[in-house]
A protein has these predicted regions:
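Glycine-rich anion/phosphate-binding loops
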Residues: 46, 72-84
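Conserved small/polar residues in nucleotide/adenosyl-binding loops
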Residues: 303-310
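Intrinsically disordered, low-complexity segments enriched in small/flexible residues
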Residues: 1-60, 64-66, 70-71, 185, ...
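Glycine- (often His-adjacent) and acidic-residue-rich active-site loop
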Residues: 65-70, 77, 99-119, 288, ...
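Conserved catalytic cores of soluble enzyme domains
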Residues: 100-220, 312
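Structural alpha/beta core scaffold segments of enzyme domains
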Residues: 88-96
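Catalytic-core regions built around general acid/base machinery
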Residues: 81, 85-89, 116-127, 306
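Structural motif
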Residues: 61-62, 95-99, 134-137, 156, ...
Length: 314
């Protein structure tokens, strides 16, 4: 990977994709300096590595922000690289995965950077319902950058270092981080309902690989893999799953393959992906006899997510 071979951003890509499968796009792109004396600043790849590779043989497009380059901030060319990646992904019908570690807008580029945000938002909106969009927040994701995971289909957050916010917690009158950290993975998962999974970087990358293997590549594709499980096997422990339908669904699924969305939000309802005879199935189940508001919103949001897919429901 040009100019950033040893960066954490490139390491994350290498850990996510199948070995030696990554092909970089736009590795020689740097910032287009126009204002605020940026001419002498080094901006390798303009702070974001973009390209494509495979996960368990499936094509995916990936961008990974490099916090060592101006804090991973979004400038004009940084944004154009991400928007261009979306164009390639839509043409080939493959998912986009964003690995976010960004301090927000690059103030030195002013309105050029603001326009870049608009280009990314437009690309995401055009891809919505066409290809899966996945975002993992490993560091800071603040300001206008916070809209990007909100517009994607699946969001992951590093539980200790991930921070997701439009305004910092201290911007709320009478609040401070020690009182209520509204930027934390716990808050964004339990209260905002934005995060599907929170954990370590290794856990997140593993979960993304599992999720990609279950999802259709696009809205015209079917998610199907060869079933290696015994379709006639007995599920002896179903009686012990009465209190948690999530466990029940994982027992029913081929080889226990199971991915729960919005796991920390609206816990009275389970929304998940499982596999039955090799086919990916969307599942909605209740954990309690009465739905709360959050659980109902969660179920409706999940059905909207799958509205453009051809898969079955349970």
């Amino acid at each position: 990977m040009s100019n950033t071979a040893q960066s954490l951003a490139s390491t994350r890509i290498a850990s996510l994709l199948d070995e030696n499968s990554f092909v970089e796009i736009g590795g020689q792109v740097t910032a287009r300096s126009t204002d605020f004396n940026m001419a002498g600043m080094e901006t390798p790849s303009d702070g974001v590595i973009t390209g494509y590779g495979v996960i368990n043989g499936s094509l995916v497009y990936v961008y990974s922000q490099d916090a060592s380059v101006m804090g991973g901030t979004i400038g004009e060319m940084h944004a154009k690289k991400i928007a261009r990646l979306y164009e390639f992904a839509q043409k080939t019908g493959a998912p986009v995965i964003g690995l976010v570690d960004c301090a927000g807008m690059r103030l030195q580029e002013a309105t050029d950077a603001l326009n870049g945000f608009g280009e990314i938002y437009m690309a995401q909106a055009m891809a919505s319902g066409v290809i899966p969009q996945i975002t993992a927040v490993f560091g800071t994701c603040g300001g206008g950058m916070a809209l990007i995971p909100a517009m994607t289909d699946f969001t992951f957050m590093e539980s200790k270092n991930g921070k997701l916010f439009v305004n910092s917690p201290n911007a709320l009158d009478g609040n401070h981080v020690s009182k209520c950290d509204t930027a934390s993975a716990d808050f964004q998962g339990e209260e905002a309902g934005l995060v599907d999974f929170a954990g370590t970087e290794e856990e997140i990358l593993g979960q993304i690989r599992n999720l990609v293997s279950m999802l259709p590549a696009n809205n015209e594709d079917e998610a199907y893999t060869e079933c290696e499980d015994d379709l006639n096997r007995a599920c002896a422990d179903l009686a012990n799953c009465a209190g948690d339908t999530g466990i029940l669904l994982s027992q029913l699924s081929d080889n226990g393959i199971y991915f729960e969305t919005k796991a920390a939000y609206g816990k009275d309802v389970v929304t998940a992906f499982i596999q039955l005879n090799g086919a990916t199935v969307g599942a909605v189940a209740n954990r309690s006899e009465i739905y709360g508001e959050d659980g109902t919103v969660k179920a409706v949001s999940y059905t909207h997510l799958r509205a453009h897919e051809t898969g079955a429901y349970l």
